[in-house]
């Protein structure tokens, strides 16, 4: 994808490639009509702050707009406020299609997924050891509505370590706090919750001088770790991050790109491999992949067996767990069952007819799909007849992979009046059809941005079939 962009006359400073993400999270990514001119973008987004540049992505050969653009602001808070207020809005009276606005991923981050709102609302600060949570709240409430504050304490003595977290309701509020709070707080955007606390503190102290100068925090070597962070519970307050998150899913990173077949052949050594997927990074030559096993025991064995494995010779691959929101404290209690499951997986490995009926929890009959999530879901409801007229269609995006169809149906039928839910072959997207708009809106309100079975969902209203047929095929 080639980016062709220009600054309108009088646009002022245009940042170089090295400063596109300076300060961090100051660039927004837009999905717009391919007929929207740059002048309209500048007019609609300039009220939010100082626009340094606008890029419109164009076709390499025809030079036509692809309906994608980037807007670079001078400050992160300006970009965040633009995202909050313009996402889902229409740009003009003749443009009735709502636009989509996201914070653009850093070009050097090693990841090409969207930056989620939850990742932009929590800040990490250095505070006096005498501070209470109420003191922390009092200092930072001037920048916006605070969801919670927490102070990191010594597990043995219970004394404050002089570090804390503040989570705001909006990304723009967190950005305002970082930009405007007293420099002695050394405020930075917090790392994902599943990163070990000792590592977070070491990163914080080693990069304090860099952060004070406004540089971006160090990028995680394993970009997929932490994508599926759960909603806030008691995670920060009990300071339980010292233990590595363990799950059935693994992130694989290599300095040398690999194909899906190569990835499969490496991890198929361990029985119980469910699927593997290669992630393409347009900004580097690194290889990224996600591997999932049917059970935790197989994933643990694969992680410790293959982390550091040389493939090809001289190139060590990095393997780490991806937090799927499961509770690691239950691991020992469940390990015996999981080990038996791993043995069963090995026994039926060469018998596909048994594999398709095998349930790796010990049962082999038909079972309702199990849903693991912090989301409060309604009870199951009957589906609407297949011939029922469709009142609303929902577009579903999965990260990093689609959920099984039976799980999807179980989730989306709970809102009532579901006609059908289906996946698009070869894509991480799907659709749900409802016979009632209220049911569809309830599904969006409950599920958008949430994590179910380790998969983050984006649920939004789909374009009408007529509109979709006139558009170029999207890539995700």
From Swiss-Prot:
One of its GO terms (molecular function) is RNA binding. The modification Phosphoserine is found at residues 199, 464. GO terms for cellular component: cytoplasm; nucleoplasm; nucleus; ribonucleoprotein complex. SUPFAM superfamilies: RNA-binding domain, RBD. It is found in: Cytoplasm; Nucleus. Residues 26-106, 121-195, 392-464 form the RRM domain. One of its GO terms (biological process) is nervous system development. It comes from the Eukaryota. There is a cross-link at residue 34 (Glycyl lysine isopeptide (Lys-Gly) (interchain with G-Cter in SUMO2)). InterPro entries: Nucleotide-bd_a/b_plait_sf, RBD_domain_sf, RBM45_RRM1, RBM45_RRM2, RBM45_RRM3, RBM45_RRM4, RRM_dom, SLIRP/GR-RBP-like. Keywords: Cytoplasm, Developmental protein, Differentiation, Isopeptide bond, Neurogenesis, Nucleus, Phosphoprotein, Repeat, RNA-binding, Ubl conjugation. RNA-binding protein with binding specificity for poly(C). May play an important role in neural development. This is RNA-binding protein 45.
């Amino acid at each position: 994808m080639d980016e062709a962009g220009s600054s309108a006359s009088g646009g002022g400073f245009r940042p170089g490639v090295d400063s596109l993400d300076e300060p961090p999270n100051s660039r927004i990514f837009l999905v717009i009509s391919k007929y929207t001119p740059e002048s309209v973008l500048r007019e609609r987004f300039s009220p939010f702050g100082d626009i340094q540049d606008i890029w419109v992505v164009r076709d390499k050969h025809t030079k036509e707009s692809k309906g994608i653009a980037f807007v670079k602001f001078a400050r992160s808070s300006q970009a965040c406020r633009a995202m909050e207020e313009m996402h889902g809005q229409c740009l003009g009276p003749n443009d009735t299609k709502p636009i989509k606005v996201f914070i653009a991923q850093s070009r050097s981050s090693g990841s090409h997924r969207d930056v989620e709102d939850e990742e932009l609302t929590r800040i990490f600060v250095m505070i006096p050891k005498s501070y209470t949570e109420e003191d922390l709240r009092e200092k930072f409430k001037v920048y916006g509505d605070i969801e919670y504050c927490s102070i990191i304490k010594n597990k043995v003595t219970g004394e404050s370590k002089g570090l804390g977290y503040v989570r705001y309701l909006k990304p723009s509020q967190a950005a305002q706090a970082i930009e405007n709070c007293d420099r002695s707080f050394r405020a930075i955007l917090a790392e994902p919750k599943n990163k070990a606390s000792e590592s977070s503190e070491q990163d914080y102290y080693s990069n304090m001088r860099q952060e004070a100068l406004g540089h971006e925090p160090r990028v995680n070597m394993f970009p997929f770790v932490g994508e599926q962070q759960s909603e806030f519970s008691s995670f920060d307050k009990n300071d339980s991050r010292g233990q590595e998150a363990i799950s059935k899913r693994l992130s694989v990173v290599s300095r040398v790109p690999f194909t899906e077949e190569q990835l499969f052949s490496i991890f198929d050594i361990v029985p119980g491999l469910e699927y593997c997927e290669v992630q393409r990074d347009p900004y580097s030559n690194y290889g990224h992949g996600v591997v999932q096993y049917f059970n935790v025991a197989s994933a643990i064995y694969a992680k410790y067996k293959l982390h550091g494995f040389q493939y090809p010779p001289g190139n060590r691959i990095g393997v780490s767990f991806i937090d799927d929101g499961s509770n690691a404290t239950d691991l020992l209690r469940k390990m015996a069952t999981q080990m038996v499951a791993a043995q069963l997986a090995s026994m039926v490995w060469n018998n596909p007819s048994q594999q398709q009926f095998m349930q790796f929890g010990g049962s082999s009959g038909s079972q309702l799909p199990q849903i693991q999530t912090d989301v409060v879901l309604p009870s199951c409801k009957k589906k609407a007849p297949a011939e029922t007229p469709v009142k609303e269609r929902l577009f579903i995006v999965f990260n990093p992979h689609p959920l099984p169809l039976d799980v999807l149906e179980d989730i989306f039928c709970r809102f009532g009046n579901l006609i059908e839910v289906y996946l698009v072959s070869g894509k991480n997207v799907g659709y749900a059809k409802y016979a009632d708009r209220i049911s569809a809106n309830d599904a969006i309100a409950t599920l958008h941005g949430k994590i179910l079975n380790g998969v983050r969902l984006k649920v939004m209203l789909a374009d009408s079939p007529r509109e979709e047929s006139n558009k170029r095929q999207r890539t995700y």
